[in-house]
Curated annotation (Swiss-Prot):
The name this protein goes by in its record: Actin-related protein 5
The keyword Transcription regulation appears for this protein: yes
Keywords: Coiled coil, DNA damage, DNA recombination, DNA repair, Nucleus, Transcription, Transcription regulation
SUPFAM superfamilies the UniProt entry points to: Actin-like ATPase domain
Name of the gene: ACTR5
Function: Proposed core component of the chromatin remodeling INO80 complex which is involved in transcriptional regulation, DNA replication and probably DNA repair.
Quaternary structure and interacting proteins, as annotated: Component of the chromatin remodeling INO80 complex.
Coiled coil: 290-329, 355-386
Transmembrane segments: none
A Pfam family annotated for this UniProt entry: Actin
Organism, scientific name: Gallus gallus
Gene Ontology terms: cellular component: cytoplasm; Ino80 complex
Length: 611
């Protein structure tokens, strides 16, 4: 197998975002809009200004995550980290929190932490408020309650002058427009949590016919993690979600024909040429693998000294306990000699003994054991350190007590450290012995074969993970069938792919193949890929903000918020469709309906007053 097919995990740590100093063009002649792509995977923020001195790139890019440590008891020392300040997500995985449920923000206290991070790192200098207009992305067909809470947060907490909401994939479509705007097309947006099929007619979203698939990059990462953990149970803990996301981003691809691609992987030659080996981190210095004979000898002697000290400590503790028990038994024997029979018999019962003979026998045995323990302690103090490497000493040890102690130490060492059980040092082993070669690095490698296509395939075949949903191809066909033939032909001339999953190699070819199968014979269609699938949403929002900076179209002012409610939305070319809440009106109560109730009230008055 080619060595170039071995890839090491980068395990890159996130660098904390610096506090940026905005240029003067951001505030003069008036505050420019602040564009925030509020994605469930990543938050991107930057300025929208026509001045060339202001970067036309998102200045902040961080994961939409926050972690709050508990600190000491009472909350003292608690710390909150947001985005790139986390460093690495794996050690804090159990503490990570996201404001999103799927792709809809529902935890507004966590959303406030993300906004605080954005405003603080971008250097917003206004006191007590954010005096910049905000352009914010939201989910397709965002629930009114979610928009109401978001508007309340922006207007009440940050005192923003105005805000505009738009859909990220429609902003990307707006940024990549290839015809004179407004234009029509079919937008396929596949992100971290969801995949959407969005028909756009004459520059406006047709919300009645848009469809959502509850699968995205998050589910693909979890599926890939389960596949590899089942394949390599020995590396269960090393197969983390962060590494699975790295595999998806850099080593996965979409098969143009999934079944045919699986057949290719059955060929050993194809497998050898296309498998990717992911190298897990490991340590070469294993026990006994790289130690020299001198290091092994020194290690043995250190362990021997520690075990001798441990045995000596145990003997001293045993001697102390035996001595205390012997003193108690001698005290009971003195009661017998003094004639205190009642106390003597009571003490025998407490000691679980039956007679004075049994007491005397136990005293003799305990005295002998104490004497032997004292001799062992004295012998250990004067004994020379035993060389356990030399298994055949020149002169035999004639002292049985010393021999017993040495054997006890050696057995303890062999149980404690497998290194001590070796027969001979390396220098004394026969030269002809051939040691088997074991590639430790290969043992810590993950071989990616069909897994490279199985994980991304779930957006086309959700049944792979047990989801009862249709994939992109079936959903796209279902949406197209809801239009007339003329409108279908118009939509398929501009099929637009965007979102993080559009980065998979082969996605465009797969969509073209699916369209070729479902469209009439010899009909034409065109599939376009976003120039930057992950960043075009921010670029499109910036384009819209620069073009509509001085207009009223699409901007919700504070007056609109106070008069029409937090769920109010001003529509524009990249926004959702606003569907206001229509509460049923109560019918007014007529005088005819009130007459019977008045008569009933008069008839059931106070009986005392009637009398």
């Amino acid at each position: 197998m080619a060595a170039g097919r071995v890839f090491a995990f980068r395990d890159a740590r996130w660098a904390p975002d610096p506090v940026l100093a905005p240029s003067a063009a951001v505030r003069s002649p008036q505050p420019v809009p602040l564009v925030i792509d509020n994605g469930s995977f990543q938050t991107r923020a930057g300025w929208a200004a026509a001045d060339p001195s202001v970067p036309a790139e998102p200045l902040l890019r961080f994961r939409s995550l926050a972690a709050r440590s508990r600190g000491a008891r009472g909350g003292a020392g608690a710390e909150t980290q947001v985005g790139n300040d986390l460093g690495s997500p794996e050690p804090l995985r159990w503490l990570l929190r996201s404001p999103f449920d799927r792709n809809v923000p529902v935890q507004l206290e966590l959303q406030e932490l993300l906004f605080d991070h954005v405003f603080q790192r971008l250097g917003v200098a206004s006191q007590g408020c954010v005096d910049h207009p905000i352009v914010l992305t939201e989910a397709v067909c965002n629930p009114l309650y979610s928009r109401q809470m978001m508007s309340e947060l922006l207007f009440e907490c940050y005192q923003v002058p105005k805000v505009s909401y738009g859909v990220d994939s429609l902003y990307s479509f707006y940024h990549n427009r290839r015809q004179n705007w407004p234009c029509s097309g079919l937008v396929i947006s596949s992100g971290y949590q969801c995949t959407h099929i969005l028909p756009v007619l004459e520059g406006r979203l047709d919300a009645k016919n848009c469809k959502r698939i509850n699968l995205g990059g998050c589910q693909a990462a979890v599926y890939l993690q389960r596949l590899l953990q089942l394949k390599y149970p020995g590396h269960f803990a090393a197969i983390t979600l962060s590494r699975m996301e790295e595999i998806l981003h850099e080593h996965s691809y979409i098969a143009e024909d999934y079944t045919e691609e699986l057949q290719k992987w059955r060929s050993p030659e194809y497998y050898e040429n296309n498998v990717h080996k992911m190298q897990l981190p490991f340590s070469n210095k294993l026990l006994g693998s790289t130690l020299t004979s001198e290091e092994k000898q020194e290690r043995r002697q250190q362990q021997l000294r520690r075990l001798q000290e441990l045995n000596a400590r145990r003997r001293e503790e045993k001697l102390q306990l035996d001595q205390e028990r012997l003193d108690r038994l001698l005290y009971v024997q003195e009661l017998l000699e003094d004639g205190q029979m009642d106390q003597f018999h009571k003490a025998l019962v407490e000691l679980n003994m039956d007679s004075a003979e049994e007491l005397q026998s136990y005293i003799n045995k305990l005295s002998l054991a104490i004497e032997q323990t004292k001799q062992k302690i004295l012998q250990a103090e004067v004994n020379i350190e035993v060389d356990i490497v030399d298994s055949k000493p020149e002169t035999p040890d004639l002292d049985p007590l010393s021999s017993e102690q040495s054997l006890e130490d050696v057995e303890s060492i062999n149980e404690f450290e497998p290194l001590f059980a070796e027969e001979q040092p390396e220098a004394e082993k026969p030269v002809a012995a051939v040691q088997p070669v074991f590639n430790l690095a290969e043992y810590h490698q993950l071989f990616l074969g069909t897994e490279r296509i199985r994980a991304p395939e779930i957006i086309f075949q959700p049944s792979l993970i047990g989801e009862d949903q249709t994939g992109i191809a079936e959903t796209m066909q279902y949406v197209l069938e809801r239009y007339s033939k003329e409108q279908q032909a118009l939509l398929v001339q501009n099929v637009f792919l965007t979102g993080g999953n559009a980065m998979y190699p082969g996605l465009k070819a797969r969509v073209q193949k699916e369209l070729l199968e479902m469209r009439p014979f010899q009909s034409s269609f065109q599939v376009h890929l976003a120039s930057s699938p992950t960043l075009d949403a921010w670029y499109g929002a910036r384009d819209w903000a620069v073009e509509h900076m001085t207009r009223e179209e699409g901007w919700i002012t504070r007056k609109d918020y106070e008069e029409k409610g937090g769920e109010y939305l001003k529509e524009h070319c990249a926004s959702n469709v606003y569907v206001p809440i229509r509460l049923p009106k109560q019918a007014p109560r007529t005088t005819e309906a009130l007459a019977p109730s008045r008569a009933l009230a008069a008839g059931t008055g106070n009986p005392c007053e009637q009398a």
